[in-house]
Amino acid sequence: MASKSWLNFLTFLCGSAIGFLLCSQLFSILLGEKVDTQPNVLHNDPHARHSDDNGQNHLEGQMNFNADSSQHKDENTDIAENLYQKVRILCWVMTGPQNLEKKAKHVKATWAQRCNKVLFMSSEENKDFPAVGLKTKEGRDQLYWKTIKAFQYVHEHYLEDADWFLKADDDTYVILDNLRWLLSKYDPEEPIYFGRRFKPYVKQGYMSGGAGYVLSKEALKRFVDAFKTDKCTHSSSIEDLALGRCMEIMNVEAGDSRDTIGKETFHPFVPEHHLIKGYLPRTFWYWNYNYYPPVEGPGCCSDLAVSFHYVDSTTMYELEYLVYHLRPYGYLYRYQPTLPERILKEISQANKNEDTKVKLGNP
């Protein structure tokens, strides 16, 4: 009798569970609930580098947003073009063989075109893409080792080709023009680096890996030298924290990347995670990691934002359109901080030289 009652109880539990699941599915359909295709970033590990890849947002081919320039023919890009020459940035993008087609090619088709030089760093060489083969293994525990080898490769082959050296992931979107404005105030021969500054574990703080970080030429030299002299080691698997510790050991300053009114420019998540209040729960690690008090909502982000992380391939093109194409008619930019006097003089002199050429009839 007792065993029959126990069997009935188990049958009741199973039936209840199945009924609950069926009802949940029914309500989802009736209410038109959408499947969340955004990356799952609400993990407990602040150093988890890449979004959970569910395969839903992969695009088959690249898109060329610059193919139709009919609405940009009278656009004045003089300042941006001058900064491109004055503030030279080499970008290297952390990727892997499995991500060249899924992610890296969309970086290549969008923001990477504005780098003075761009390199895609993988564990294996790919001459067609192309990607540099660092001869490492793949996996999160290899990220710092890949980072060290990538910077060593850049130092050996491209040290004189740029003034600043940006590391980004293949799911990071970067606005290079805003980064050049930020860096224009600084001397690349000084030991300094910039990114989204976190505070735990390192006295001066360190830069979030996902939001990307940029080293001055002198900072790059010191970082590479640190491993020649054994002042730093490659034993850690936590890339951004380990690099931050090494920077502090080598007396490389953790710079303040906020804009002139104190708003953050480097962002470790996609825009909506910063802009929408309540998206990131207060128990989330992010709130305790920021070096400067974080702001939630529209005040979170500078109008001259530099980067966003966990950007899937679809959002990569959405950001490209929003940043470089969408404009409200009849508005001039409200927030346009001035350039350093040194840069302004150089631009003015360049324009004078160009005017002289025109007057003399030279092309």
Curated annotation (Swiss-Prot):
Mn(2+) binds at residues 169, 171, 309. One of its GO terms (biological process) is angiogenesis. Its main location: membrane. The modification Phosphoserine is found at residue 235. Residues 41-72 are annotated as: Disordered. Disulfide bonds join 91-115, 232-246, 300-301. One of its GO terms (cellular component) is membrane. Aberrant O-galactosylation of IgA1 molecules plays a role in the development and progression of IgA nephropathy (IgAN). Genetic interactions of C1GALT1 and ST6GALNAC2 variants influence IgA1 O-glycosylation, disease predisposition, and disease severity, and may contribute to the polygenic nature of IgAN. PANTHER family: BETA1,3-GALACTOSYLTRANSFERASE, GLYCOPROTEIN-N-ACETYLGALACTOSAMINE 3-BETA-GALACTOSYLTRANSFERASE 1. This is Glycoprotein-N-acetylgalactosamine 3-beta-galactosyltransferase 1. It comes from Homo sapiens. The gene is C1GALT1.
